[in-house]
């Protein structure tokens, strides 16, 4: 079929085509008495969106025709449109009697329900202007609508069935009938209309435009239509009919609130929410509809404030831009809509002042304050409990919760508060600690990675690669130029979860920078931080570790006493031991023999290394600054590292004490690892305790021995050491195993083997003996409840299953036994000292009695309690 031209002769052929299709009436658009202007292509344009008078009828849109693709908006023949739609596009009178229609009365106007059900309204479409043979989209209007199907309704334009002709002779006679039977109003004329194309109200419903005059938006012929998407669900909307194009039609005050003029504007190519009025039947549907956060962006340029927007007196929440701000209907997180002070008009007394600090990251837990006017606040009946909303997962921190509770309730804002999910984030640290069956590890400086986040879990699947050659060349250049600070800084930037440094580079950092005697404090700290980062991202194992026991011995012996990075290196060594032990324990529980700790600290393989650690520990304890060493060691002010000096022996004793305390803690951690690396912790602890016994007897002062026992991390090892000391101090050794009965036996049969500071204060010797018995009872409780006698491989299952410890031989003591032994010990002390007990010693004896009671789960009556205390 040849395309028709725009001339009048071709349009006269239109009745012939209608007759071929079996239809008799036609519309003759050539009988227009009013002069028409031509556009650039020489075609006559008839703009049906403009009203010439009250006698002109309002043409309606028949949406029942088959849609066409958006590509057919261009000036083509009407025959092309007719071929796609299956019937004539323009016709004078259509007999609708043969078509069954479902009607209902809305606002005293009949409306076809098939129009409401078959079309989903998304946003503002361009209106249409009909030329001789073409359909042109024109500029959008304040009451225009966009239909689903990519603007395919443009080919479905049809005059109303009650309008037989648009000629001047029939205008007056047909005006009343056409106005009463119209399906949908055409866009209202643009008079003093200020509407951005992106922020339009509900389709097919006239709303008051802002009282602000501005030029009309550009024509749709020059601006391509926006690509909008909408959900598959159909949102129903009422279609009030108009008898004539309104100049200013107010919204009817119903229970259905109309959206204000500051509705959300959606940018192009961004899927958004359907910009339509929410009716009561739709609100119930939206309450159960999940929404993904972050899908409704809002910018200040897309919002046109209008304080004159009508508000609903109640019954439904206020809907700014079709986003429901109500904790009962549709709460949403701060990541959904980003408000700025310019987006929302300020109402005094109703809204808090918003600043830039109110824009929060969506990952942060926070409260949501939805701004709404008092007239639009939800009724108590419409509020829904927040826990019923399945998609809301806003976490609330305790600090934020206190703030929200302390703030008074404002009438214009609704605070969205959520409950912390049970068994959620707060249980993760507990579960994480279960992975470490000993005490918590020596913490990284990057301690937040103890609980791996989402990025860390995702990075585990990526392939590891060495640092690229070009970047590595920059590092080697700084090494050749002897610029250690540049080397460290380059590596700090280049090391990442995907890229690891070569082994020789790590060895250079340890030996040439960290253990260098000429580097500054800042360079040493940077080198240590770099090693910690490498250890965090790429933990060393038995094959990749870059230190050995020979290097550690050199640093801890006399030769390394003057190295300023001595303590930092020891911390790095302990960190590598701890990380590798825990990694092996979590991933390959049966392969602890392949860990670094098993290679260097096993009592079966390397007992001399364990003896070295004990020797370094006792040396650090005896030189902890409480007594000045004879060689007068002191520390540098910046690093806390020992330096040899023959003058000023009493300078900076606190720094010396702190340095040695750090060394003591690190060495005690190494011993606790040595207890666990072998299959039987009991055998390992017995061997280490035998090695340690002679060194403990050589500790000269009580304060140093107290430091030695209180810093010991392994409770099993402390029990074994104290047991050996008490066994050697008894005149008649006992065959009882480590138990409560054995502790009672030590109470009345042991004497102190440890050196006393002065012979004049003999009661202090007994005071220390009672203190050691307290240490023994306390550690014994840890051994029983934490299953420390079992292998670390089996300990996890015992803890998770909450298996109670097995009763030990000698733990079945009674209240009478405890009372009898305590009274005998008091009598013995008075006899040995020749004087009444001092208050300090009395308190410790009473505390020992309570520990025995609670250790045996005994509940003594009040009489023996008072009797025992009075006897003291």
Swiss-Prot record:
Keyword Cytoplasm assigned: yes
Compositionally biased intervals (Low complexity): 163-181, 292-313, 369-384
Record's protein name: SUMO-interacting motif-containing protein 1
Source species taxonomy: Eukaryota, Metazoa, Chordata, Craniata, Vertebrata
Stretches the record annotates as NSE5-like domain: 467-802
Name of encoding gene: SIMC1
GO molecular function (one): peptidase inhibitor activity
Alphabetical keyword list: Cytoplasm, Nucleus, Protease inhibitor
Role noted for this protein: Plays a role in SMC5-SMC6 complex recruitment for viral restriction. Forms a complex with SLF2 and this complex is required to recruit SMC5-SMC6 complex to PML nuclear bodies and sites of viral replication.
Any one GO CC term of the record: sarcomere
Region (Interaction with CTBP1) location: 1-367
PANTHER family for the chain: FLJ44216 PROTEIN-RELATED, SUMO-INTERACTING MOTIF-CONTAINING PROTEIN 1
Reported effect, residue 480 to K: Loss of interaction with SMC6
